[in-house]
């Protein structure tokens, strides 16, 4: 099967394409700090979006921790929408900016809607930032959940594998 041509609206997101792997750290007022290993894959099918698949495992044991999947939907200017779903019962819709840089791209999005399944923990707000500089991707995540205000929760520094 041949790879379809990249849709022109995805041009600013090209630096994200590929598989990224690396360590991360998490902290939040209601839990103990922790470390993890993250794998993040950005791909395309020739349509005006990139697909995102993410998973994390405990760094020492390899036990699964988290997973999510979704789409980055560039809007033709410097705006991007990000739609994500998690098996924990959380669905997020974000809007934000894509800024092309000399070294890659910076994406900063904030939630315009967070919905939770009846059995999921209540998450009220989220923010995500992805910064590509060459073959390094730095990811940061903030959330307002469990009665806490918007607080930095996760950071990972990933290296491009493919």
Briefly describe each language-model feature range.
Residues 89-90, 107-127:
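Acidic, glycine-rich flexible loop segments
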Residues 1-49, 55-64, 133-135, 142-162:
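Amphipathic/hydrophobic helical signal segments and adjacent flexible N-terminal regions
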Residues 59-99:
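Helix-adjacent hinge/juxtasegments
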Residues 22, 50-54, 80-84, 106-111, ...:
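Short hydrophobic/aromatic-rich beta-strand segments that constitute the beta-sheet cores
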Residues 35-37, 45-47, 65-69, 75-79, ...:
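Short connector loops at helix/strand junctions that flank enzyme active sites
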Residues 87, 113-116, 135-137, 143-146:
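Short acidic/polar capping segments at secondary-structure boundaries
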Residues 22-36, 83-95, 109:
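N-terminal short leaders/motifs
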Residues 37-43, 68-73, 93-99, 125-131, ...:
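Hydrophobic/aromatic beta-strand elements that line small-molecule binding cavities or substrate pockets
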């Amino acid at each position: 099967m041949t790879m379809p041509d990249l849709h022109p609206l995805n041009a600013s997101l090209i630096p994200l394409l590929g598989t990224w792997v690396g360590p991360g750290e998490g902290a939040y007022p209601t839990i103990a700090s922790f470390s993890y290993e993250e794998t993040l894959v950005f791909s395309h099918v020739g349509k005006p979006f990139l697909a995102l698949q993410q998973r994390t495992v405990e760094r020492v044991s390899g036990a699964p921790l988290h997973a999510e999947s979704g789409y980055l939907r560039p809007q033709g200017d410097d705006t991007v929408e990000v739609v994500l779903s998690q098996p924990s019962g959380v669905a997020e819709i974000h809007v934000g900016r894509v800024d092309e840089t000399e070294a890659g791209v910076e994406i900063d999005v904030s939630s315009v809607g967070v919905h939770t399944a009846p059995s999921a923990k209540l998450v009220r707000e989220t923010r995500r930032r992805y910064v590509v500089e060459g073959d390094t991707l730095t990811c940061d995540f903030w959330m307002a959940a469990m009665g806490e205000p918007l607080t930095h929760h996760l950071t990972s520094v990933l290296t491009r594998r493919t």
